[in-house]
């Protein structure tokens, strides 16, 4: 039986603690993008949503800095590995990974 790799598209949104410095927040964003690339993903779109008010306190924080990354990969383990990486990162207070359709990928303004 042959196993074919399927190209899939994903979106990840994550929130970091507001107590981090601007430099630390940007570094965290770069680390997540680099992790995706190292695991065989290709970044298609990225966006810094900035500081946002939370609907309810999370770890006693009322706001957090949000980031969005859309990527594609043939590595079926990448979403789970990214989920685990975000889970163990103490600076990340919330995250969400989900599969999207190719037509839902936003275009970076070049």
UniProtKB/Swiss-Prot annotation:
Q: Which NCBIfam families does the annotation name?
A: S6
Give the gene symbol: rpsF
For this protein, the record's PANTHER family field holds: MITOCHONDRIAL 28S RIBOSOMAL PROTEIN S6 (PTHR21011), SMALL RIBOSOMAL SUBUNIT PROTEIN BS6M (PTHR21011:SF1)
A Gene Ontology cellular-component term: ribosome
Under Pfam families, the record lists: Ribosomal_S6
The record describes the protein's role as: Binds together with bS18 to 16S ribosomal RNA.
What keywords does the record list, in alphabetical order? Ribonucleoprotein, Ribosomal protein, RNA-binding, rRNA-binding
Q: Which InterPro entries match?
A: Ribosomal_bS6, Ribosomal_bS6_sf, Ribosomal_S6_plastid/chlpt, Transl_elong_EF1B/ribsomal_bS6
Gene3D superfamilies assigned to the protein according to its UniProt record, in alphabetical order: 3.30.70.60
Which organism does this sequence originate in? Aquifex aeolicus (strain VF5)
Which protein is depicted? Small ribosomal subunit protein bS6
Q: A single GO BP annotation from the record?
A: translation
What taxonomic ancestry is recorded?
Bacteria, Pseudomonadati, Aquificota, Aquificia, Aquificales
In terms of domain of life, where is this protein from? Bacteria
């Amino acid at each position: 039986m042959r196993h074919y790799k399927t190209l899939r598209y994903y979106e990840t949104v994550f929130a970091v603690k507001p107590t981090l410095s601007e430099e630390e927040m940007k570094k965290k964003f770069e680390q997540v993008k680099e992790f995706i690339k190292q695991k065989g993903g290709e970044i298609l779109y990225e966006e810094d949503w900035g500081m946002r008010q939370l609907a309810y306190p999370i770890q006693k924080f009322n706001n957090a800095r949000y980031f969005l990354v859309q990527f594609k990969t043939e590595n079926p383990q990448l979403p789970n590995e990214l989920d685990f990486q975000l889970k163990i990162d103490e600076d990340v207070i919330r995250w969400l990974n989900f599969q999207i359709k190719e037509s839902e990928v936003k275009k970076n303004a070049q």
